[in-house]
A protein has these predicted regions:
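A common structural junction motif
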Residues: 28-35, 86-89, 97
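Short, surface-exposed ligand- or partner-binding patches at beta-edge/loop junctions that are enriched
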Residues: 82
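Short S/T/G/P-rich N-terminal loop/turn motif that feeds into the first structured element of a domain
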Residues: 1-63, 67, 71-78, 104-110
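C-terminal structural segments of small proteins and small subunits
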Residues: 76-79, 89-92, 96-99
């Protein structure tokens, strides 16, 4: 069953516009850069994202949102625990983030 992986960022106030642009570009590059160890092909089914534009005032300071889709929990687990491209990105971006939130779910499972 497909797994959605939602990632929310709040960049630090002193993060430059260039850093934010690089961070969001690198986040989106995960779709092609994360390679499955068995198939040797990209395994993130979908990845979209953008800057928060909500008018509801309930963003808690979150500035950017991304939604990924994986084919299975196993693929999501590999991404989180073992993917070297993802690990390198996490190491780089963490110093520019004030806050991040990650939520995963299987569609229709409540």
């Amino acid at each position: 069953m497909a797994v959605k992986h939602i990632v929310l960022f709040r960049f630090k106030a002193d993060a430059s516009a260039e850093t934010v642009k690089e961070g969001t570009s690198r986040m989106l590059s995960l779709k092609e850069g994360c390679i499955h160890p068995t198939t040797q092909k990209p395994y993130i089914k979908a990845l979209t994202g953008g800057k928060d534009i909500s008018i509801e005032g309930a963003d808690n300071g979150i500035t950017h949102a991304f939604v990924m889709e994986f084919e299975s929990i196993e693929d999501r687990d590999h991404y989180v625990n073992n993917d070297p491209y993802h690990a390198e990105f996490k190491s780089w971006i963490i110093s520019y983030l004030e806050k991040f939130i990650i939520v995963d779910y299987e569609e229709g499972v409540f």
